[in-house]
């Protein structure tokens, strides 16, 4: 009968640095090998695709060279060294069993950095929403460079709010980082790598706060932050703001644990809970209520089981309310302006949705490429992690489990079940499901550690199963280094046509094409700021969105069926100040030969010039015209434009646009209209369609990130429609006097013109509601600091008592 292994010392005199250095070297060499080799392979594949050559293992092999061989050899040597150390003296398994604090932190750091090295592949990030966030990082940095926090961008959707209708925290951090490094793509990669690393550390710290062992916390942290379900949110879905949300979740629960289990309320943890609550709301408002629901369920069960103290409810509730008050700067302005943009009031409400078999299988079906679309975010969690989670649920409820472990399991299991059904289209629900699955994984390791018959290598076996499961999905070379032609085109447009707009059409390899109506941004907006009719965040687009998007779609349909723009479509685009339609395919700029009016222009290749584009449309009179109900909102998403025949709402908007043209009677050459259609003409306004004796002259027109400036000379009084959206959150000044603009029929600005020189400036304004929100947030922050200071002073000489479990 084999003898049980002799007990190992629980605390060695010093960390086993040779083993740690060997593991760190193995991680570094393997990461370098994958970065170098996959970068070369992707570049080779892109070159073959561009030239029409076959892509196969044999055709890709020549991409590898001497450096790849040396790195692979070094990796093999270090791997053998680690295996030898384990075989000769059980070095790795002993490390995991005794769980020396220094060894665990170093090992965790090495593994987290390795699991996040896919963020560091050279090239630009293209997947899904990546471009939208990179473009916003760039725009934020431009504002910071000019000395202000930008609230508005004129480069997207004819002009739209930049921060108010999305979580501003990530964009402020990303903008500052972009300003520091000078490159928005590099800033995103740095942010993703650092926050991914911190997420694993904070998750580990939270599990330790629960009283779970270091080995259990290590395996669970690696399993969650290395899972494809986690990484695909960022590498394949480009959901970079949710990096911060995922990072803050364990911090929120960690602070709650301390508040609810200590007899004395610590000022630091009270402040940490308040700040984390505020940060969750400010980063992405819809995720904060979901975090609160899960915390309430987890905490409610912990209270009923006696693991949490009822007396802790008051400090946690006050900290949470204080955090919500601090976040008013990201709440009240949204409530005020929701009717001015495409955001829907119920977009953040919690819903229940029963999971289908297909979605459940996706959690355990191996994948290393994008496997979900739209508002579905479930992806492969890892078969090893899920198996351990099932074992963890069973062992935590078995008769051999300690009371402490059982209480954690009973609090976690309902959260896992809730994670299967709680849903909202704008909430990335996989982060909550993965968070609690990781807790069950930790409980599984606790169960293995409690079984001394399993031997000292059982934790190593579990860790290796998890690592082997996540390793193949952690190496995801999604960055591309063959898109410089797009960056060149973007810089060209910024320098050549800074005050004009463009439309982008994507050409597929099979010759099909689709116009970009958003929400998205491409490499042309990564390093430059050309003006676009589409944009990067459609919920923040103004009420002109559906009309401009349908105008783009009409242009696409014209080009598909006739190869050229119709006169009416060209007129619609011209009054939006669209001067160019540019085309891109996977390898080049340039429109196809079927676009009959396209001609070459430098780095843009063949492009279409839209005749008579202008930011102004003049008239002597106004006429009432309002769209039927249901055309302004809700927002049209890009798939609806591809329906054949036209989707009913798109067709209704197209009919209204034609009615708008007929009513206005636009002369695109003179930039005049018989009458400007507005939704509510002022009382006494003339409807006489008299023409100008002399058409007003646009003497100056400049557009920057958050400011539009025009100078119009008029010999007769009249009106001007600007190719900028009506938005009450902006301020319009004419010759220094604040002027209330009229809302045009398609929600463009309409202003009066006086005889003489009209100097017009459009800039964001600070509304009374925003000032109130800032005052509440500032007061709450000051109050939170004062309360935390008082609590710290009060507790300085009083020892704290932990209710149960190891909080070290």
Question: What label would you give each PLM region?
Answer:
Residues 2-493, 497, 562-565, 578-583, ...:
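Membrane-embedded transmembrane-helix bundle of lipid-linked glycan/lipid transferases
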Residues 285, 332, 338, 508-511, ...:
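Short loop/turn segments at secondary-structure transitions that flank enzyme active sites
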Residues 114-117, 141, 461-539, 640-645, ...:
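Extracytoplasmic
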């Amino acid at each position: 009968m084999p003898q049980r292994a002799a007990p190992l010392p629980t605390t060695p005199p010093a960390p086993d640095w040779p083993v740690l250095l060997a593991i760190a070297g193995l991680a570094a060499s393997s990461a370098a090998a994958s970065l170098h080799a996959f970068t070369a392979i992707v570049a080779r594949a892109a070159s073959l695709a561009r030239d029409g050559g076959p892509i196969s293992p044999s055709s890709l092999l020549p991409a590898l060279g001497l450096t790849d061989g040396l790195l692979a050899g070094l990796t093999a040597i270090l791997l053998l060294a680690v295996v030898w150390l384990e075989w000769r003296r059980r070095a790795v398994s002993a490390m995991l069993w005794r769980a020396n604090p220094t060894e665990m932190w170093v090992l965790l750091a090495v593994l987290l950095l390795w699991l996040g090295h896919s963020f560091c592949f050279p090239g630009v990030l293209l997947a899904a929403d990546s471009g939208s966030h990179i473009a916003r990082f760039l725009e934020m940095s431009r504002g910071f460079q000019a000395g202000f926090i930008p609230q508005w961008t004129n480069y997207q959707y004819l002009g739209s709010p930049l921060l108010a209708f999305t979580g501003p925290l990530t964009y402020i951090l990303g903008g500052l980082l972009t300003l520091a490094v000078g490159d928005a793509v590099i800033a995103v990669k740095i942010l993703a790598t650092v926050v991914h690393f911190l997420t694993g550390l904070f998750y580990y710290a939270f599990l330790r706060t629960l009283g779970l062992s270091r080995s259990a916390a290590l395996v669970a942290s690696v399993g969650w932050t290395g899972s494809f379900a986690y990484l695909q949110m960022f590498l394949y879905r480009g959901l970079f703001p949710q990096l911060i949300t995922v990072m803050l979740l364990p911090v929120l629960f960690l602070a709650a644990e301390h508040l609810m289990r200590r007899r004395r309320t610590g000022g630091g943890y009270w402040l940490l809970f308040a700040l984390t609550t505020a940060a969750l709301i400010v980063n992405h408002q819809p995720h904060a209520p979901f975090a609160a629901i899960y915390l309430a369920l987890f905490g409610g069960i912990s209270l009923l089981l006696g693991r949490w103290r009822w007396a802790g409810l008051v400090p946690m509730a006050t900290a949470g309310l204080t955090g919500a008050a601090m976040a008013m700067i990201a709440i009240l302005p949204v409530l005020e302006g929701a009717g001015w943009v495409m955001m829907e009031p119920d977009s953040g409400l919690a819903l229940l949705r029963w999971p289908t078999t297909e979605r459940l299988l996706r959690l355990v079906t191996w994948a290393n490429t994008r496997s979900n679309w739209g508002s579905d975010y479930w992806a492969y969690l890892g078969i090893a992690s899920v198996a351990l989670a099932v074992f963890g649920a069973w062992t935590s409820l078995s008769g051999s489990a300690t009371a402490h472990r059982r209480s954690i399991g009973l609090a976690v299991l309902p959260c896992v079940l809730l994670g299967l059904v709680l849903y909202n289209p704008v909430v990335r629900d996989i982060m909550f499901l993965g968070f609690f699955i990781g807790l069950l994984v930790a409980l599984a390791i606790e169960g293995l550690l409690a079984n001394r018959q399993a031997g000292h290598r059982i934790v190593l076996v579990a860790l290796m199963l998890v690592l082997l499961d996540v390793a193949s999905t952690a190496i995801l070379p999604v960055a591309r280094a063959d898109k410089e032609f797009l960056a060149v085109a973007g810089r060209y447009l910024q320098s050549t046509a800074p005050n004009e707009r463009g439309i982008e059409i994507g050409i597929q390899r099979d010759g099909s094409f689709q116009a970009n109506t958003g929400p998205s941004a491409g490499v042309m907006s990564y390093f430059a700021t050309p003006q676009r009719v589409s944009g990067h965040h459609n919920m923040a687009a103004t009420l002109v969105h559906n009309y401009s998007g349908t105008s783009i779609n009409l242009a696409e349909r014209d080009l598909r069926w006739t190869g050229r723009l119709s006169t009416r479509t060209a007129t619609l685009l011209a009054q939006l100040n669209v001067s160019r339609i540019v085309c891109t395919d996977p390898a080049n700029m340039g429109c196809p030969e079927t676009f009959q009016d396209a001609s070459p222009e430098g780095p843009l290749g063949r492009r279409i010039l839209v005749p008579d584009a202008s930011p102004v449309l003049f008239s002597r009179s106004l006429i009432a015209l309002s769209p039927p109900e249901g055309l302004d909102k809700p927002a049209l998403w890009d798939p609806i434009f591809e329906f054949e025949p036209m989707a009913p709402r798109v067709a209704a908007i197209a009919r209204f646009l034609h009615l708008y043209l007929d009513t206005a009677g636009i002369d695109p050459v003179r930039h005049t209209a018989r009458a400007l259609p507005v939704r509510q003409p002022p009382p006494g306004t003339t409807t006489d369609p008299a023409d100008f004796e002399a058409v007003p002259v646009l003497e100056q027109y400049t557009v920057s990130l958050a400011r539009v400036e025009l100078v119009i000379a008029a010999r007769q009084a009249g009106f001007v429609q600007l190719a900028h959206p009506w938005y009450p959150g902006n301020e319009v000044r004419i010759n220094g006097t604040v002027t209330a603009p009229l809302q045009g029929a398609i929600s463009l600005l309409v202003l009066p013109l006086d005889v003489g020189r009209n100097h017009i400036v459009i800039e964001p304004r600070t509304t009374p509601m925003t000032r109130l929100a800032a005052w509440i947030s500032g007061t709450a922050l000051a109050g939170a600091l004062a309360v935390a200071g008082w609590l710290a002073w009060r507790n300085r000489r009083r020892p704290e008592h932990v209710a149960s479990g190891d909080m070290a």
